[in-house]
């Protein structure tokens, strides 16, 4: 137990309550905090989720992984008693006259991330998201106003505060963007010494030897296994980061740190599990992934292993790699009938990005998305890959985006066609609006507003949620029908007009009323399940084994490269 100065700790690190919570051990429960605070019932947003989990000395037991990375950097230079990471409810305990700087991290402080913008626009209820409200509570904390320490804001959402014009209003002195290993320590040293500071600091690509393991536990037992991506998607920021696989001893050290603090789960932070020790041309390394999962799973105290993201192309390219790791992951899955009564069987889950069904959009903005397959095979690879995951006990989630720059109605219809092809598969679709993120290549593009959505784009949202209800919650259809009809006639009719009528009728399960004449007719037969279609399987197999085409990549591999040929 550390003895902290009652007159204030020199450096205090914290985050909003919604980002500190572990949501009963379910990482995907955190999505609740992106919705408008006014529409989240208190029975769902349980008060106990936001209560502090403290160590005996008052420091936080579990905090976001990025904050632990900053703590590890600061511990290189500052004494242990000079740095504390605390729950925001405890700021008045640690911020005092001797406090020099308060560091805050936030993923979505102004509600400008993909999910929050999309669904706050559709729900159309004014006010902050839960994350936004909790962030404001941090920066308006009485202790910060009373003692006026320097405030440094980092995290993936730091850009949002500048974008919203709230930097001065929220009393923020420095914004830190990007990877911090080469910049953060210097900023805090200058802040403590009272030296002049820049208003904004941008991190640079970090060599692997500069990545320090965390020294205290992260929420959900997060450990970083890879960093960066390299596929070159222009709407995404991680693709601009140098791709690394962290060494197994480094990973195991972080696992042990989490378990020692009382976590019973480990969460693999990665842009794609299949990047772990992959080949130079993205070849998945099944044996290396199996060794990783076995090593982590064998650490005493590890009951569960969670995954963040995967890519679908490696699944279709090397199904045997999926077969190799799936039994190991199934042994450590939290998603079982004992965790949720509506789960009929255990399953593994992770998030991958479909993004669009339009080959034109994919070629323009995400040409390397399914490399080594040619982008023309995009539908087949996504459907086949999803089927392979299902066959190995996975029930993944997949994001799909509409509102791309220069998206046409035909592009949107192509996404609708891909949704139709996925029928018969277990996947949870997350339909979103395009958002120009600050550190992505498309940052200067304009995002579409809810008022500008075309009928096809409204139908895109309706089809995705109709798909989800059919796959995941058929028994709740009467509830969805009542809620859809009630919300339309009492609210959405006045908020969005008649353009919301057909989509809501589709969710209400009135397909004849909810269909889209001409473009996407109601009652069209579901596509043949390509998982069992020999022609589609042969198409993918031929691509893997024989095709060799140039693909222009963005990011670290900017030269043209060729599709892999299986020998």
Regions found by a protein language model. Give the residues of each.
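Radical SAM enzyme core and accessory elements
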Residues: 1-43, 456-567
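N-terminal pre-triad scaffold of radical SAM enzymes
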Residues: 5-18, 205-239, 252, 256-260, ...
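Conserved SAM/AdoMet-binding glycine-rich loop
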Residues: 13, 257-396, 402-404
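A solvent-exposed, charged loop/short amphipathic helix patch at secondary-structure junctions
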Residues: 27-57, 109-136, 364-375, 454-466
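Short, charged N-terminal beta->alpha structural module
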Residues: 48-77
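Glycine-rich beta-alpha loop elements in corrinoid/cobalamin-binding modules
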Residues: 66, 84-211
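Flexible glycine/acidic-rich beta-alpha junction loops that bind and position SAM and/or redox cofactors
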Residues: 102, 110-114, 267-281, 316, ...
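Catalytic cores of alpha/beta
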Residues: 162-170, 324-325, 405-421
């Amino acid at each position: 137990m550390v003895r902290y100065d009652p007159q204030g700790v020199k450096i205090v690190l914290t985050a909003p309550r919604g980002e500190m919570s572990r949501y009963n051990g379910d990482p995907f429960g955190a999505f609740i905090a992106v919705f408008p605070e006014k529409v989240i019932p208190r029975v769902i947003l349980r008060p106990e989720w936001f209560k502090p989990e403290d160590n005996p000395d008052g420091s936080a037991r579990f905090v976001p992984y990025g904050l632990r990375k900053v703590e590890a950097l600061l511990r290189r230079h500052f004494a242990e008693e000079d740095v504390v990471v605390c729950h925001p409810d405890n700021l008045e305990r640690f911020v005092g006259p001797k406090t020099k700087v308060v560091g805050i991290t936030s993923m979505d402080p102004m509600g400008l991330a993909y999910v929050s913008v999309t669904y706050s626009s559709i729900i159309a209820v004014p006010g902050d998201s839960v994350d936004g409200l909790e962030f404001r509570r941090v920066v308006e904390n009485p202790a910060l106003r009373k003692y006026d320490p320097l405030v440094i804001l980092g995290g993936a959402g730091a850009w949002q505060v500048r974008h919203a014009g709230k930097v001065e209003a929220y009393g923020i002195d420095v914004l830190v963007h990007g990877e911090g290993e080469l910049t953060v320590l210097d900023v805090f040293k200058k802040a403590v010494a009272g030296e002049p500071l820049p208003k904004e600091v941008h991190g640079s690509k970090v060599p692997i030897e500069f990545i320090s393991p965390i020294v205290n536990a992260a929420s959900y037992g997060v450990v970083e296994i890879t960093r960066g991506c390299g596929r070159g998607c222009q709407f995404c920021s991680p693709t601009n980061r140098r791709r690394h696989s962290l060494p197994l001893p480094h990973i195991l050290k972080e696992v042990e740190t989490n378990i020692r603090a009382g976590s019973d789960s480990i969460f693999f932070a990665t842009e794609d599990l299949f990047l772990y020790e992959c080949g130079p041309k993205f070849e998945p390394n099944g044996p290396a992934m199996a060794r990783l999962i076995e090593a982590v799973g064998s650490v005493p105290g590890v009951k569960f292993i969670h995954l963040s993201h995967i890519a679908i192309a490696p699944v279709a390219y090397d199904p045997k790699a999926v077969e190799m790791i799936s039994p190991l992951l199934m042994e450590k899955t939290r998603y079982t009938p004992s965790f949720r009564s509506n789960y009929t069987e255990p399953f593994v889950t992770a998030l991958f990005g479909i993004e669009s069904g339009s080959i034109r959009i994919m070629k323009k903005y995400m040409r390397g998305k399914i490399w080594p397959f040619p982008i023309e095979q995009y539908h087949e690879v996504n459907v086949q890959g999803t089927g392979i995951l299902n066959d190995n006990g996975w029930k993944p989630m997949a994001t799909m985006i509409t509102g791309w720059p220069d998206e046409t109605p035909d592009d949107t219809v192509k996404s609708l066609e891909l949704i139709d092809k996925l029928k018969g598969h277990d996947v949870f679709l997350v339909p979103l609006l395009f958002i120009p993120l600050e550190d992505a290549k498309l940052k200067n593009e304009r995002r579409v507003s809810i008022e500008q959505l075309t009928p096809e784009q409204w139908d895109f949202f309706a089809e995705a949620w109709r798909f989800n209800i059919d796959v995941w919650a058929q028994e709740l259809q009467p509830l969805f029908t009542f809620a859809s009809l009630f919300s339309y006639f009492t609210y959405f009719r006045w908020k969005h007009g008649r353009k919301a009528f057909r989509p809501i009728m589709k969710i209400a399960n009135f397909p004849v009323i909810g269909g889209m004449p001409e473009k996407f007719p109601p009652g069209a037969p579901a596509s043949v399940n390509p998982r069992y279609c020999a022609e589609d399987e042969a198409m993918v197999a031929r691509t893997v084994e024989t095709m060799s085409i140039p693909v222009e990549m963005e990011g670290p591999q900017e030269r043209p490269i060729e599709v892999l040929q299986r020998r």
